[in-house]
C-alpha cells in the first residue's frame, strides 16, 4: 500500500507536469502545421486582385430566358461563375425574361441575379418587352404589345435591375463598353432613334478608345443560315443601314456582343471568319441558356488584345478549339 501511495503523492505531480507540457507542445505544433497548410491552400486557390492581374475578365451570358426550361442548369452556371475569382463583370445580352416580360418573370430574374457574386450589366431583348402578354401566358401567341405596354415593360426592366438607364456605358480595363437595350416598337431587335442618338454621342466622346458594343441582336451577315430566320430582318440589329453607318463612322468599335439567335457552340457560325462585319468588327455570338448544355464566352481584356474563351458548363471545361484573339484598333 505504501509503495502505491508514494507513487501517487511523490512521482505523479512531476510526471503529470511533464505530460502536460508535452501535450501543449504537440497541440501547438499541430495548430502551426494546420495554419501553414491553410495558408498554402489559400494562396494556391485564390486569384490575384485586379490590380495585379494582366487582364480583366468579362463573362457573357447568352439569353437567360428566366425562369424558363432547364432552370437547374442555369443555376449551376451561376454557381460555377460565382466560384471564378477573376471575374470583373458579368453581362447578360437580353431576353432576360423567358417569354413576355411578365411581373412573375421579372421577379424570377431578379431572384436569380441577386445570387450572383459579381457585378452585373444587362440589356433588353425582345422577350423582355415587345410582346403583348396574352390572357393565357401558356398560349404561345406572340403579338406586338401596345406602345403603352412596351413602355411599362421597359420601365419594369429598368427598375428591376436598378440600371442607371436602359442604355449605359462602363469602362473595363481600358475598354469602353456600350450596353445598348433593344427598345424599338416594331423591330424585334431594333434600336430606336433616341438610343441611336445616345450611341452617337457616346462614341463621339470616346473616338480614340477601343469600344465594345453589347446588343441583343447580331450584325447582319455574321452567321451562316443554319436556321431559316438567320440574317432575316427580325433576327439582325435594326435599322441595318443606320447601324452600318454608325459603325463605319466609328473605327474605335471593334467588337459586337450579341445573343438572340441561340447559336450553339457546336455550330460553325459560333466562331468563324464570317463573324467579321465589314472586315473590321468581330461579332461574338452567344448561346442561350434555355438548354441542358450551356456555353458561356469570357472576354479576357489585355491592353493589346482581347482573348475570347468558351466554357462548356455541362462538361466543366474550357474549349480551346474555340479560343480567339482579337486585336483592338490602335490610334
Where are these regions (language model features)?
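Short, low-complexity, charge-dense intrinsically disordered segments
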Residues: 8-19, 25-26
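Bacterial N-terminal signal peptides
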Residues: 28-39
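N-terminal active-site segment of His-dependent metallophosphoesterases
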Residues: 45-108
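Alpha/beta-hydrolase fold active-site loops
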Residues: 56, 88, 167, 174-175, ...
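Active-site neighborhood of phospho(di)ester-bond hydrolases with catalytic His/Asp-centered motifs
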Residues: 60-62, 90-95, 120-126, 180, ...
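Extended active-site neighborhood of metal-dependent phosphoesterases/phosphodiesterases
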Residues: 102-206, 242, 248-252, 266-309, ...
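Active-site-proximal segments of metal-dependent phosphoesterases and phosphodiesterases across multiple
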Residues: 190-192, 206-257
Amino acid at each position: 500500500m505504501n509503495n502505491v501511495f508514494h507513487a501517487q503523492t511523490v512521482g505523479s505531480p512531476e510526471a503529470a507536469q511533464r505530460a502536460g507540457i508535452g501535450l501543449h507542445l504537440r497541440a501547438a505544433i499541430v495548430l502551426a502545421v494546420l495554419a501553414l497548410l491553410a495558408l498554402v491552400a489559400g494562396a494556391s486557390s485564390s486569384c490575384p486582385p485586379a490590380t495585379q492581374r494582366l487582364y480583366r475578365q468579362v463573362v457573357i451570358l447568352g439569353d437567360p430566358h428566366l425562369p424558363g426550361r432547364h432552370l437547374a442548369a442555369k443555376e449551376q452556371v451561376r454557381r460555377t461563375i460565382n466560384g471564378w475569382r477573376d471575374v470583373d463583370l458579368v453581362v447578360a445580352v437580353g431576353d432576360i425574361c423567358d417569354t413576355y416580360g411578365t411581373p412573375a418573370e421579372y421577379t424570377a430574374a431578379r431572384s436569380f441575379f441577386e445570387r450572383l457574386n459579381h457585378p452585373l450589366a444587362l440589356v433588353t431583348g425582345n422577350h423582355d418587352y415587345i410582346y403583348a402578354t396574352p390572357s393565357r401566358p401558356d398560349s404561345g401567341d406572340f403579338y406586338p404589345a401596345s406602345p403603352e405596354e412596351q413602355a411599362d415593360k421597359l420601365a419594369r426592366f429598368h427598375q428591376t435591375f436598378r440600371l442607371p438607364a436602359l442604355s449605359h456605358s462602363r469602362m473595363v480595363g481600358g475598354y469602353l463598353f456600350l450596353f445598348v437595350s433593344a427598345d424599338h416598337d416594331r423591330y424585334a431587335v431594333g434600336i430606336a432613334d433616341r438610343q441611336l442618338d445616345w450611341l452617337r454621342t457616346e462614341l463621339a466622346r470616346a473616338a480614340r478608345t477601343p469600344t465594345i458594343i453589347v446588343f441583343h441582336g447580331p450584325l447582319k451577315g455574321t452567321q451562316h443560315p443554319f436556321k431559316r430566320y438567320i440574317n432575316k430582318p427580325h433576327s439582325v440589329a435594326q435599322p441595318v443601314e443606320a447601324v452600318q453607318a454608325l459603325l463605319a463612322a466609328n473605327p474605335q468599335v471593334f467588337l459586337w456582343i450579341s445573343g438572340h439567335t441561340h447559336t450553339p457552340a457546336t455550330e460553325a457560325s459560333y466562331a468563324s471568319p464570317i463573324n467579321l462585319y465589314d472586315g473590321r468588327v468581330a461579332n461574338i455570338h452567344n448561346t442561350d441558356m434555355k438548354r441542358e448544355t450551356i456555353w458561356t464566352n469570357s472576354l479576357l481584356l489585355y491592353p493589346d488584345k482581347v482573348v475570347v474563351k468558351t466554357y462548356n458548363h455541362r462538361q466543366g471545361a474550357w474549349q480551346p478549339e474555340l479560343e480567339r484573339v482579337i486585336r483592338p484598333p490602335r490610334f
